[in-house]
Amino acid sequence: MIRKIRYLLFSIFLAIFFMNSSFSQTANKFDFERIEDNSFLIEEAYNQDPGVIQHISSFQYMKDHSWLYTFTDEWPVPGRKHQLSTTIPVLNNGTSGFGDIALNYRYQAIYMTRFAFSPRFSLLFPTGSWQKGLGSGVMGYQLSIPFSYLLSTKIATHYNLGVTFTPDAKKADGSKFDQTIYNYGLSMILLLNKNFNFMFEVVGNRTFIKTAGTKTIITNSLFINPGIRYAINFKSGLQIVPGIAVPIGVGSSNGSSGIYAYLSFEHPLWKP
């Protein structure tokens, strides 16, 4: 099942890439105001506009009483081509505290009216307590490949592939292991109008854990995440986007569910 989804995503990426050359013929039709870069579990491929910064809060509460809050700050450096951001997590998995903080760099390789591509590289700093199971205890590395494609004037789509590698991570008992996580996802967003969207996301991952002298442990997760978002725009340039969704486990994650809340503040800080 997961392998088929990966092949499907890869095929979609190739199709979108080779359609690139024809986009200019219909560019004007798709050049309209809409909500961008405000997805929930999926990463959209749009960097910040020059001079505009974004502050994002998200909170996810699951049926097993675990929860995760993240705060992300995104800054153009100094324009759209390069972007730096930080993500600070606070979580509860039986005990509460800060997780491992991420420093992210994203490059806007392609930005067209209908298509965008912006690969991201992240460093995961060991700020969470590995003794409490809140962090890895070592530096981690993450690569993400997000694509965004405007399918029509009413439907936007986004596609993600990524990998996270944490060598010599520490368990609470002090033992070490290597962890590799492959993630994938896609979303379809119905643009009802410029300020209100219906969203449907699918996200999954496959995790490999290798400890000394043991076989590799493999686990999978797969969630669908239907939701809505709404943009509130001010004359000053401030945009506030609240959103809510319901993550539902399917396949190997069947029986797991929760609630997801999102809030973004985006505003100009300087004139480019």
Where are these regions (language model features)?
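Cleavable N-terminal export/targeting peptides
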Residues: M1-I35, L269-P272
